[in-house]
A protein has these predicted regions:
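Cytosolic regulatory regions built on CNB/CRP/Popeye-like sensor folds
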Residues: 1-162
Length: 162
C-alpha cells in the first residue's frame, strides 16, 4: 500500500531520474496511479528465466542482480542499481527472459503492468516517451558496466597466460 509519504518520496525520486522539467508535479504524481509499489525481500525472484515480461520495474532502493543458469549452478552476469529500470527488454520485445532478476538486497520498486502501460501511452504520451528514454539510459548503464567487467576479466585472463 502506497502512503502519502511514499507518494511524495516517489515524486522526488522520479524528478531526479526522469526529465520532469516538461511535466508538472501533478502529472508526475498521476503517473504513480499507473504503478504498483512493492517491497521484495533479499533473495526473492523478481522475474524469472523463460517468462515474458508483463511489467516494467523501477528500482527505487536496493540492488538487484541478473543471473543465468539453473538455480543449482547460477552465474551472476550483472547488477541493477537504485534509479534504474528492470525488465524492459522482455517487456518491449515480448520474448522470454534469458536472465533471472533477483533482489540482492531488500528492494523497493514500482511495477508498471502492461495493461496500465498501454493506458498510459494513450492518456500521457509525453510520459511514455520519457519512459522509453529512461529505458535506453538504464540499458546503457547495464551495457557499460557489463562491458567493463568483461574487459577486466579478459585482461586478467591474458595477464595469467602471459
Amino acid at each position: 500500500m502506497m502512503t502519502e509519504n511514499d507518494r511524495d518520496a516517489l515524486v522526488d525520486f522520479l524528478a531526479r531520474h526522469v526529465d520532469t522539467q516538461i511535466l508538472t508535479h501533478a502529472e508526475v504524481s498521476a503517473f504513480l496511479d499507473f504503478c504498483d509499489f512493492e517491497i521484495i525481500e533479499r533473495g526473492r525472484i523478481i522475474a524469472d528465466i523463460g517468462e515474458v515480461g508483463e511489467s516494467l520495474y523501477f528500482l527505487l532502493d536496493g540492488t538487484a542482480e541478473l543471473i543465468v543458469g539453473p538455480t543449482t549452478n547460477e552465474v551472476p552476469v550483472g547488477q541493477i542499481h537504485a534509479g534504474e529500470m528492470l525488465g524492459e527488454m522482455s517487456f518491449f520485445d515480448r520474448q522470454p527472459r534469458n536472465v533471472r532478476m533477483r533482489a540482492r538486497s531488500s528492494v523497493r520498486l514500482l511495477r508498471l503492468p502492461r495493461e496500465k502501460y498501454n493506458r498510459l501511452r494513450l492518456e500521457h504520451p509525453v510520459f511514455t516517451v520519457l519512459l522509453l528514454e529512461y529505458a535506453i539510459v538504464s540499458l546503457d548503464h547495464l551495457y557499460r558496466r557489463t562491458s567493463t567487467d568483461v574487459a577486466q576479466l579478459n585482461q586478467y585472463i591474458h595477464s595469467m597466460s602471459g
